[in-house]
Amino acid sequence: MKIVTGLRRCGKSFLLFHLYKNYLLENGVSEEQIVELPLDEIDNIRYRNPFELNTYIKSRVSDPTKRYYVFIDEIQFCAEVPNPYLDDSSAKVTFIDAVLGLMKLNNLDLYITVSNSQMLSREVLTQFRDRGDEIHVLPLSFAEFWDAFRTLSATASPSVTDAWREYCTFGGMPYILSLDSPEGKSRYLKNLFKETYLKDIVERKDVRNEREVLEILLDFVSSAIGSLTNPAKLEKRFLSEKKIKVSHNTIAKYLDYFSEAYILDAVKRYDVKGAKYFSTPLKYYFADVGLRNARLNFRQIEENHIMENIIYNDLVRRGFNVDVGVVSISTREWDVRGIQKKNNVRLEVDFVANKGSRRYYIQAALSVADPETHAREIRSLRRIEDSFGKIVIVKDDIVPRQDKDGILYLSITDFLLNEQALTI
């Protein structure tokens, strides 16, 4: 079984019911071998009963000589019902029971999608443990966005620069590409938060009286992407800026809600030399920068932080496990009395990206043309003594090159449009 997860409105249903279905048809699978069941449609409400769901699917896949592909959309609409064979009224039968039974059929390839409105995707995934494979769908990458942008653009020769500007502002939620005006795009992204994401969390987690706190917390995190923070710092910010007392434990819980809904990713710091993790502080990145910008009413679009967020998302998309790197060094200085003092300094590496036996240390900067900026950006990289790749990604349009220390310099477009760029 495959469980299709991801941020709401990022294209999970389109992936199954259009792209994958067309792929199957083009490769010889007949229509009768594809069973589509969107449970959010009124015509299918009887199948929200897990017993009816089980009976219906089995009736559609009855020929053992054929391979069937079953797509169940919005599985969370399948309700809990009493177990008629037990006297205990608290004993319930759920879609989990139905799906686990269907998984035992050898002629069935089962795909389910789940929306956050009643059950968060990660909660469903936990229910199946190792019995289901996750297909995680993300908003459009810049490479995907660029392909669509130049196809749909009214301009004869759209530029990558124009696409980058648009992507940095409105992000990669697929529906954005069908909207013409900046006002329409802005309104769509704001409504996603108001009518979909926040509403989902408030209803699912039963925090109706805390919606204002959730909104303020999102705004605080939005304004601090790429910056170190933790619940204790945010607790102080609530008190100083909003005169609202919210405990750090409550803040930590609400941040987890946003992570469970795939809105935010929490990224820990990793001590490169000590090979250990720091529990706090950490950084947060948005699954989509357009959503982040919408939270701040498009007022605080700092390209360096936006670029950092986009790089993080692309590394995750490519299958890397990503941490923020810390390089601890010792320096010695003489004070005014002539006494030598030892100082312990922690330098930061924007990203430590791991995938199997590969590792890359990555810094992000708008430009390193200024010598002082250049020295600052590579200081931590030069202090790392292992042989893994060290990379600086800049916004400037540069030709890929390596310096005398073996540090690779790439433009942001080379990195985003070429998945092999890190190995140049």
Provide a role label for each language-model segment.
Residues 71, 109-115:
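Structural recognition of the conserved hydrophobic beta-strand(s) that form the central parallel beta-sheet
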Residues 178, 182-358:
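Accessory nucleic acid-recognition modules appended to NTPase machines
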Residues 397-424:
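Domain-level recognition of nuclease-like catalytic cores that cleave nucleotide substrates
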Residues 76-111:
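Conserved Walker B catalytic segment
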Residues 15, 19:
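Hydrophobic positions on the alpha1 helix immediately C-terminal to the Walker A/P-loop
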Residues 115, 122-228:
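Interdomain motor-coupling "hinge/lid" segment immediately C-terminal to the ATP-binding subdomain
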Residues 35-66:
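Short glycine-rich substrate-engagement loop in P-loop NTPases that contacts/grips substrate
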Residues 4:
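Hydrophobic anchor at the beta1->P-loop junction of P-loop NTPases
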